Amino acid sequence: IRIETPDAYLNTLGGALALAADGIWDGQVWLHGAVGWRMPLSGWRAAYTGDALGWHDRARTHFDAYAASQVTEIPNTISHPAQDSVLNLARSEKRWGTPQYSNGYICRNPRNNTQMHHYDMNLCYIDELLWHFNWTGDLEYARQMWPVLVRHLAWEKLNYDPDNDGLYDAYACIWVSDALYYNSGAVTHSSAYNYRANKMAAVIAEKIG
């Protein structure tokens, strides 16, 4: 990747970005980190990398791997609230059939829809997928991934906007910080992600019929 600008310092970034990106690619998915936390996480920010650098094949490989990790055969049978009392209600109870661990949830590791994790990594995974559609304009792939998107949107609504006010709670969905509401809150960042996802879904639905 070459960058050509009048600024000699900016021109060095192409190789640096490509090298860093290649370092977090494990052949199947983008990893959480290159050195520390070198492990897969479905919705970590690394998955924006492929499309930004023109590596759309890697991006699609990542998205396919985690689409196969979406729960599809466990309906929600346990109502809100389903928080873990041992952890002072700070996290969802890890039990299949709760709102979090039911259809639509994307599990922690690629091609494995049986492994719970405490994050809502759905949110950024879907945002990255939608950016992939923006970058590539690949309507056939959008059609293929449509069921994944629909299940995700229903899952987010069930879990994080049960009062239907259009404002979504946040649950460990981006950087885990008290300043960003680790759990609950009807906050701006999770609402903004969901607003964009629903708006993009409407556009995609119109295009794919």
Regions found by a protein language model. Give the residues of each.
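The feature captures the catalytic groove of carbohydrate-active enzymes
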Residues: 32, 96-124, 154-209
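Substrate-binding groove/exosite segments of carbohydrate-active enzymes
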Residues: 2-146
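Alpha-helical scaffold segments in carbohydrate-active enzymes
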Residues: 16-20, 65, 148-159, 200-203
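Aromatic-lined carbohydrate-binding surfaces of glycoside hydrolases
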Residues: 37, 70, 149, 156, ...
